[in-house]
Design a protein with these regions (language model features):
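Glycine-rich, aromatic-bearing surface loops/beta-hairpins
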Residues: 53, 60-124
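A structural signal for well-ordered alpha-helices, especially hydrophobic packing surfaces
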Residues: 9, 16, 56-59, 63
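Structured domain cores in non-transmembrane regions
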Residues: 22-56
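Long, hydrophobic N-terminal alpha-helical segment
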Residues: 1-32
Length: 124
């Protein structure tokens, strides 16, 4: 499953970064225009707005793809995804953060990232 989720997550993180860059650029255009008593216009503004719209749609699509796999995207900035699982008959989340080699942590459904425990501890 991680083999399918990881590339989606990598793409989402890159798209989120690009979205923020375009949003910042658009905000700069708008601030300059307001400072001059006008409205932001022109091809650069149109291109930035189109990029924001396109990236927003792509991010939504990527999130839906991750959810369709049964995973829960917890934090896009961290690249954090939970995989529902059972441990001793209890519902838990297997927890993965982008950049980790494999799924090596878990936490209870009422716990978050701070409550992660190593899977190896269960095998000792």
């Amino acid at each position: 499953m991680l083999g399918r989720v990881r590339p989606l997550l990598e793409e989402l993180v890159a798209q989120r970064r690009a979205l923020r860059e375009h949003q910042d650029r658009l905000a700069e255009f708008q601030a300059r225009a307001r400072g001059n008593g006008g409205v932001a216009r022109g091809p650069e503004v149109v291109a930035a707005k189109q990029a924001v719209d396109r990236l927003t749609a792509q991010i939504r699509q990527g999130i839906q793809e991750i959810q369709a796999l049964g995973c829960v995207l917890k934090d896009l900035d961290m690249g954090l995804v939970d995989f529902p699982a059972l441990r001793d008959g209890q519902e838990i989340y297997l927890c993965y953060r982008l950049g980790e080699e494999r799924i090596a942590f878990w936490h209870g459904v009422d716990e978050g990232y701070a409550g992660r425990k190593p899977l190896e501890a269960d095998q000792a």
